[in-house]
Regions:
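Helix-coil boundary and interhelical linker segments in multi-pass alpha-helical membrane proteins
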Residues: 1-13, 76-96, 127-133, 166-177
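C-terminal ends of transmembrane helices
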Residues: 27-32, 50-51, 104-114, 141-148, ...
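Interfacial segments of multi-pass membrane proteins
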Residues: 53-57, 79-83, 100, 104, ...
Length: 215
C-alpha cells in the first residue's frame, strides 16, 4: 500500500467528511434544544457527554454520548462504503475518516476549534473499525473506573492499551492510526494528567467545575 496507488481526491474527501461529521457539537445542540442553555457555561464548559450529565438531564447526556459515538462510527462506515466502490485503498480511507472525525470533535471549526476530549467519538470509531477492540476499550474503561473511581484515568488507561489490543488481535494496519489517536487523547487530557499526579483530580461523582475526562 503506497501513496502512489491511492486516489488522492477520495482520501481528501474521507478526511473532510470525517471532520465535518466529527465537528457536530451534539452536547451543545441537545442542551440548547432541551432548554438547558449553553453547555459551555455549565460545569467544565466541555461539550462532551460527561459535562452534559452535569446539566441534571441524563437523557441529554445519553443523547450526547450516542451522538458523539455515532458521528465517529458513521464517518468510518461511510468512508468504507466509498472505498468499496472506488479505487481508493480501504485502510487509508477508513483511517483518514477516523482521524478527521476525531479532529473534528476535538477542534470543531464552528466553536472556534474548542471541542471535547474525544472518548465517546473514539469509542464509535473503534466499534466501526474493528468492534472487538471497541468492546475491549469499553471494558477496560469500566474496570479501571470501578476500581479507581477516576473517569480520566479510565480513559487514559483504555487509550494506552488500544494499540496493544490491535496488535494482539493482528490488526497491524490500524496500529499506526491508534497511536496517533492516543497521542491526541493524551494532549486533550493534559490537564487531567496534571491533576492526577498532584492528587487533585475529582473522582466519579464528585462535584467540580473543572474539566474531567469527557467525550
Amino acid at each position: 500500500m503506497g501513496f502512489t496507488d491511492l486516489a488522492a481526491p477520495l482520501l481528501l474527501v474521507a478526511l473532510m467528511l470525517g471532520y465535518l461529521l466529527g465537528s457536530i457539537p451534539f452536547g451543545l445542540l441537545l442542551t440548547k434544544a432541551a432548554g438547558l442553555g449553553d453547555i459551555r457555561d455549565i460545569g467544565s464548559g466541555n461539550i462532551g457527554a460527561t459535562n452534559a450529565l452535569r446539566t441534571g438531564n441524563r437523557w441529554v447526556a445519553i443523547g450526547t454520548l450516542i451522538g458523539d459515538a455515532g458521528k465517529g462510527a458513521v464517518a468510518v462506515l461511510l468512508s468504507g462504503l466509498l472505498a468499496a466502490h472506488t479505487s481508493a485503498d480501504q485502510t487509508w480511507m477508513l483511517s483518514l475518516a477516523a482521524l478527521g472525525a476525531f479532529l473534528g470533535h476535538l477542534y470543531p471549526v464552528w466553536l472556534g476549534f474548542k471541542g471535547g476530549k474525544g472518548i465517546s467519538t473514539l469509542i464509535g470509531i473503534l466499534l466501526a473499525l474493528y468492534w472487538p477492540v471497541g468492546l475491549l476499550f469499553c471494558a477496560t474503561w469500566a474496570i479501571v473506573a470501578l476500581v479507581s473511581r477516576y473517569s480520566s484515568l479510565s480513559a487514559l488507561v483504555a487509550t494506552l492499551l488500544m494499540p496493544v489490543y490491535l496488535a494482539w488481535l493482528d490488526r497491524w494496519e490500524l496500529v499506526g492510526l491508534s497511536v496517533l489517536l492516543a497521542a491526541l487523547v493524551y494532549i486533550a487530557h493534559r490537564g487531567n494528567i496534571g491533576r492526577l499526579l498532584s492528587g487533585t483530580e475529582p473522582r466519579i461523582g464528585q462535584k467540580k467545575a473543572e474539566d474531567t475526562a469527557e467525550g
